[in-house]
Amino acid sequence: MSIIKKPDLTDPKLRAKLAKGMGHNYYGEPAWPNDLLYLFPVCILGTFACCIGLAVMAPTQMGEPADPFNTPLEILPEWYFFPTFNLLRVLPNKLLGVLAMAAVPAGLITVPFIENVNKFQNPFRRPIASLVFITGFIFAVWFGIGACLPIDKAVSLGYW
């Protein structure tokens, strides 16, 4: 009637993992009916309620009429392109900007190989991956905010 993952606690490899703090501490929680009958419908109904609520409370409004002869002073991309837009805008050489953007996925690909010696699944026990994530997040937010400012304040955000 239910699908339960029961560990074999007589397995010495599993016991050694659990003794080191690796693995899960919640073995035996059934996926049926806990997740499929209770959690998923709540998430689906909550998402549906948010969509309906936003459609009723804040309907989309018409913007300014398009004028092909009047362009804005500075054209900004969508918000999710702000960090890369600011990086291309701030770096003096465009090839350097493209190489800097290509270095991001290349750096992310190297993280699992650097931390290959660490077998823990806990992010607090993976200091390199956590440091790369936190540094990248701060960099993206910093450059995203800087994209909305003039180019002379784009890196410093006007602080220095």
UniProtKB/Swiss-Prot annotation:
GO biological process: photosynthetic electron transport chain
Taxonomy, superkingdom: Eukaryota
Cellular component, GO annotation: chloroplast thylakoid membrane
Membrane topology per record: Multi-pass membrane protein
Gene3D superfamilies: plastocyanin oxidoreductase, Single helix bin
Annotated GO MF terms: electron transporter, transferring electrons within cytochrome b6/f complex of photosystem II activity; electron transporter, transferring electrons within the cyclic electron transport pathway of photosynthesis activity; oxidoreductase activity
SUPFAM superfamilies for the chain: a domain/subunit of cytochrome bc1 complex (Ubiquinol-cytochrome c reductase)
Function noted in UniProt: Component of the cytochrome b6-f complex, which mediates electron transfer between photosystem II (PSII) and photosystem I (PSI), cyclic electron flow around PSI, and state transitions.
Subunit structure: The 4 large subunits of the cytochrome b6-f complex are cytochrome b6, subunit IV (17 kDa polypeptide, petD), cytochrome f and the Rieske protein, while the 4 small subunits are petG, petL, petM and petN. The complex functions as a dimer.
Similarity comment text for this entry: Belongs to the cytochrome b family. PetD subfamily.
Organism of this sequence: Thalassiosira pseudonana (Marine diatom)
Protein name per the record: Cytochrome b6-f complex subunit 4
UniProt keyword terms in alphabetical order: Chloroplast, Electron transport, Membrane, Photosynthesis, Plastid, Thylakoid, Transmembrane, Transmembrane helix, Transport
Transmembrane segments: 36-56, 95-115, 131-151
